[in-house]
Structures are given as structure tokens and as C-alpha cells.
């Protein structure tokens, strides 16, 4: 009876995620960033990180202020949406009689809550190297105070690696060669048969994802030609081949996999 109620409430319970996705991916518009020489640069989810990698600190700060000032205008909307999401998770956990929402989230993954907490504790205990890195970055950049918009720019000037998508695919194939020709054949199939939505577009969500559809997986990218974009291509294709092999070789009941296995 309880599961029938939860199933009936499923679409309603998904509303917080739907609302935030529409706000973030479709409705938010950001002012142009202005460089030190006065040139204007459009700010979108896709252009933000490349702007953060500019050696022009004026441009970086302008892009940062552009993005976060708009998010700040909707902070109450975002807070209410997050609150609704938390209430949804708490509702499901209580109805299913879990001790906590953490227990509910980890159920089915075979990952004990102790592992989750130990991971966080280990990160907290290991902040020292990160603090030293931040101090080194501040010194190398020659700034008195390090800001969020100083964290992406290369600390060595004159190093700019840009790749076309065709070059990124070639790098991916070379990197994955040790996994064998059968694996490479699937990668090529994905490259040649439109599995990938490559570039940023208006209304397209930010980030990168792989969706393991039945016909074949689909990959969402927002490719800008950076080295990180090349890494992301390889990473997401890994998810896609995982899904493809699982879907073609496992019974339906066993095709899905948990996030801990995927990553």
C-alpha cells in the first residue's frame, strides 16, 4: 500500500528537480563579462570555465560577478526549491522506515553509512596539502588575496592547449587502445553514429552526462576544446560503453548499476 502511494506521488515529488532544471538551464540569462581592454564576452554555463581560465584577471572577476549576481537574484527561489527537495527525501525515508535519509540514499548500493562518513572524515583530515597549494597558487599569480575567480587560471603563462572535437576523438581512441579492439569498435560506433550531442546550445543543460537508453546510449557534452573537455569525453564514453555492454548482455532486471559502480 505504501509503495503504491509513493509511486502515485512520483511525478509530484520530482517537481523540485524539474523547477531547478528549468530555472538553471532555460530561464537564467547572464550579462556579458568585460575584459580589461573593454571587450565584451558572453557568459553562459558553457563559456564560464574558459573565461575563468583567462590570464586577464579583470575579465575573470567580471565573469564571476556576472554569473553569481544572477544566481543571487534567485537565492530565495533556489532555497525554497532545495527545501522542497529535502522534504521529499525525508518523506520517502520515513514512509519506507529508514533511520535517516542517508540510509535511504545508500540502500541498494551495498555501501555502509560508515564508509560514507569515513570518506568525508578522510577529506577533512587531508586539507593541509590543499591549503599549501592555495598559498602556492596565490604566490605564483602574484595576488594579495586569492579569490574564486583565481582558481582556474593556469599558474604558468603561455600554456594554452586547445583541441578540435576530431582531435579529442583521436586522443580518446589512443588512450583507450589498451582496452582492446572490441572496446574501440564500440567507441567508434558511438563517434560515427551520433551518440553525442557535442556543443553548447541555447536552453541546453550545463555539464556532461551519459544516458543509457535502450537503443544505444546518448552523451551530452558542452565541448569547448579544453584539455578538461577531452578528459570529459573519455569519461562519459566510458559510462556509455558500460551501459551498452550491460544492456546487451544482462537480463533487464540486472542492467542498471549504482553510482558507486559507475564512477
Map each language-model feature to its residues.
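His/Asp/Glu-rich acidic catalytic environments and adjacent acidic regulatory segments
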Residues: 1-114, 118, 122-125, 171-175, ...
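A glycine-rich phosphate-binding loop feature that marks nucleotide/adenosyl-phosphate handling sites
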Residues: 32-37, 91, 137-155, 189-198, ...
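Helix-rich, well-folded core regions that mediate interactions or catalysis
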Residues: 82, 119-152
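Long, K/E/R/D-enriched contiguous segments that form extended
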Residues: 136-188, 192, 242
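Catalytic zinc-binding patch centered on the HExxH motif and its immediate surroundings
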Residues: 158-163, 196-216
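Short pre-active-site segment immediately N-terminal to the catalytic Zn-binding motif
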Residues: 159-165, 171, 178, 213-234, ...
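Catalytic glutamate of the conserved HExxH
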Residues: 232-236, 240, 244
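Post-HEXXH active-site segment of zinc metalloproteases
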Residues: 243-263
Amino acid at each position: 500500500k505504501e509503495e503504491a502511494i509513493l509511486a502515485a506521488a512520483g511525478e509530484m515529488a520530482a517537481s523540485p528537480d524539474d523547477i531547478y532544471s528549468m530555472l538553471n538551464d532555460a530561464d537564467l540569462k547572464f550579462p556579458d563579462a568585460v575584459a580589461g581592454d573593454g571587450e565584451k564576452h558572453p557568459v553562459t554555463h558553457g563559456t564560464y570555465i574558459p573565461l575563468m581560465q583567462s590570464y586577464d584577471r579583470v575579465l575573470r572577476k567580471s565573469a564571476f560577478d556576472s554569473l553569481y549576481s544572477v544566481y543571487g537574484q534567485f537565492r530565495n527561489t533556489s532555497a525554497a526549491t532545495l527545501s522542497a527537495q529535502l522534504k521529499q527525501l525525508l518523506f520517502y525515508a520515513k514512509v519506507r522506515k529508514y533511520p535517516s535519509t542517508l540510509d535511504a540514499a545508500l540502500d541498494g548500493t551495498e555501501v555502509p553509512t560508515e564508509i560514507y562518513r569515513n570518506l568525508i572524515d578522510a577529506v577533512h583530515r587531508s586539507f593541509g596539502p590543499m591549503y599549501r597549494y592555495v598559498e602556492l597558487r596565490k604566490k605564483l599569480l602574484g595576488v594579495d588575496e586569492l579569490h574564486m575567480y583565481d582558481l582556474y587560471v593556469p599558474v604558468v603563462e603561455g600554456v594554452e592547449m586547445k583541441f578540435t572535437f576530431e582531435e579529442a576523438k583521436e586522443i580518446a581512441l589512443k588512450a583507450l587502445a589498451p582496452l582492446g579492439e572490441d572496446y574501440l569498435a564500440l567507441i567508434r560506433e558511438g563517434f560515427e553514429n551520433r551518440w553525442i550531442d557535442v556543443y553548447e546550445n541555447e536552453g541546453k543543460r550545463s555539464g556532461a552526462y551519459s544516458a543509457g537508453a535502450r537503443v544505444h546510449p546518448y552523451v551530452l557534452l558542452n565541448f569547448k576544446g579544453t584539455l578538461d573537455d577531452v578528459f570529459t569525453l573519455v569519461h562519459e564514453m566510458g559510462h556509455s560503453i558500460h551501459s551498452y555492454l550491460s544492456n546487451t548482455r544482462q537480463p533487464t532486471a540486472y542492467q542498471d548499476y549504482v553510482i558507486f559502480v559507475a564512477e
